[in-house]
């Protein structure tokens, strides 16, 4: 019985070792510039004596992002929330090209601190 357990462990270790292969080291993602995509959002944080980690510990929690189809064209649109910058809504035009429709959709928000986002498609 002891030999069977040892044999099982050796067999499992051999299979795990043989199945590891680094020869197919291919990139799964490609970095695209904002000039190519039209998505240019930065959640810029500016700390000072009034707003910093010690006075507001949630400062580094970040904003939020939602992805959904807002105009029923079967393309995923992107909504970013900002902490110290206005929110941004990007309409997907296809082929990873987006238009900033924040102003025309009145989705920039106000001076509040936005930290999350959700999106739902009812229809």
Regions found by a protein language model. Give the residues of each.
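Bacterial N-terminal signal peptides
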Residues: 8-16
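Bacterial N-terminal signal peptides that target proteins for export
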Residues: 1-8
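Acidic, glycine/proline-rich Ca2+-coordinating loop motifs
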Residues: 1, 20-123
């Amino acid at each position: 019985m002891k030999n069977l357990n040892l044999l099982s462990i050796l067999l499992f270790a051999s299979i795990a070792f043989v199945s590891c292969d680094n020869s197919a080291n291919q990139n799964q993602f490609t970095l695209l510039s904002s000039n190519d995509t039209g998505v240019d959002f930065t959640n810029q944080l500016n700390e000072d004596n009034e707003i910093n980690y010690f006075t507001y510990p949630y400062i580094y929690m970040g904003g939020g992002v939602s992805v959904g189809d807002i105009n029923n064209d079967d393309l995923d649109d992107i909504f970013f929330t900002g902490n110290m910058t206005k929110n941004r809504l990007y309409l997907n035009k296809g082929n990873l090209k987006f238009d900033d429709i924040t102003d025309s959709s009145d989705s920039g928000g106000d001076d509040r601190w936005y930290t999350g986002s959700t999106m739902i498609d009812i229809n």
